[in-house]
């Protein structure tokens, strides 16, 4: 048994056998399991059949009533890799926090407000499976610390402090700062991420901003702006997002890229149909090199992705699904599937994938 799995079992055993300190405290075990069988092909890699794990996780969360409208709470969440029998204790959203009349503050390893602003409310595939929007939007997912995965604006961030305001007339403010634990003699990298969201009935609107300081080197600054929207009318929802990323690979060079998404979900009694179209514009600037999937300025560096999905609910917690995705890179770009990327991604590759799977919440 791996150390991480043994540690998880030990933690569960301790919680199950430990004393209950107060009636106002609670601990809950929960999770999500999702896997599918996929056929994927692309120029330069041929084709392959594979089983894919789609962000399955196991988690514990707890809360304690402190009185006066205040509470303390925690979460420990780790990836479970169904297809290869492995897992980790706390490599997903893991934090401890306190909340009250003025909002809540958490500290730990957490998704950024920038990612969360369109993750569930806008993307029909929840930035998961081969249909996920973060193949292009955000320039690929990365979990880690400052200056690591410096290409990504779709992040789970280490050493982070996260504030969520109370909701006022549908408006909620979120802000995160990731401390520069990775500081060196010449570089002090840090991250600031924020989002303002509005929910009222069938309407959702969001604006998010994120800034990476000294990720590529001393004095560099990378920024992301993202807007999102969703409107639901009966069983039909129309969704969209637009994003502007600007990188400074060196203090004297920059690379800017726009991308947008248009998506829809049609919800029936026990099933749903999903569609998403994403387009990345060609990069501009004076950088002679690309960043992540984004190609260098001055080359044919656009891309498109279309994704189709169908989900059938067997119960409130279990669903069967099918997903199709086609990711079309121009000659100067190398975008990849963000969830379960393929190993070979030469510039200009077109990836086509189809999967059938099952998801279960508990």
Predicted regions and their residues:
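Outer membrane beta-barrel
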Residues: 23-39, 47-180, 188-190, 196-201
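Sec/Tat signal peptide C-region and signal peptidase I cleavage site
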Residues: 18-22
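Transmembrane beta-barrel outer-membrane domains
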Residues: 49-53, 87-89, 154-156, 185-191, ...
